[in-house]
Amino acid sequence: NQKPQIPGLTPAEIVNAFANVEPYLNQNLTLREIAARCFNGDSKALDNRHELLLKLYGDKANTIPPRPLLLTAWAPPGFTKLLIVENQDSFLRLVEAPPEDYALLYSGGFRASATRLSSEHTRFAFLPGSDPERFKQRWLDEQAECHFWGDLDFAGMGILKALRNSLPNLQAWQPGYQPMLEILNTRGGHAPQQTRKTAQTDPGTTGCPYTDTTLLPALRQTNTALDQEAIHIPPPNAGITNP
């Protein structure tokens, strides 16, 4: 087996650091807290090394609690639907002028963490005006209507696909994606090379009909993409005047 290499540490120092892990295994510390204590303050030294810890310490390594997933939410009293938003600026704009009946959740592009959504270790930070108890009761309800809105690119579609593992009813939010699609179809998008998106991979199918039949074909045909900050969602009653 290939020996672990950590820049700045000699092989002997690496062995010593791993040997120092054991006393911390039953102290309810996260992997990054343990790493910072054993590897000269480097909290990421043990990232992606859980299998090695299992070989060294067996089931003791399984006592390390998962790192909590911290999410920001705005959940007005009486909401009935959930909208997950990929990017911070767009999330905060929607909080200022929220779509009717929706709670909003800022995902922060957590593609790699999507499978942890339903974990007991997930934590929420609620913006003022929220009803935290109602949100916690309803947000993973498989009967509740839920949507995702993010960048119109393969990575964004991949996030939607991953989120559907925890939220099977999740659909792309058409009020957000439709105006983006119109821009994309009129050559208003950017090339993947412009924003270093060439490494993004096509997710294939997501299980969301609108995504699979409309959004993904447009991305493939135009070979361009559009970040969600490019558009502004008008307030629910914009343009409506009282008689």
Label every model-predicted segment:
Residues N1-E145, F154-P243:
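Nucleic-acid enzyme cleavage-core boundary/entry regions
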Residues F148:
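Terminal peptide-recognition signature
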Residues D151:
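G-domain G4 guanine-recognition motif of GTPases
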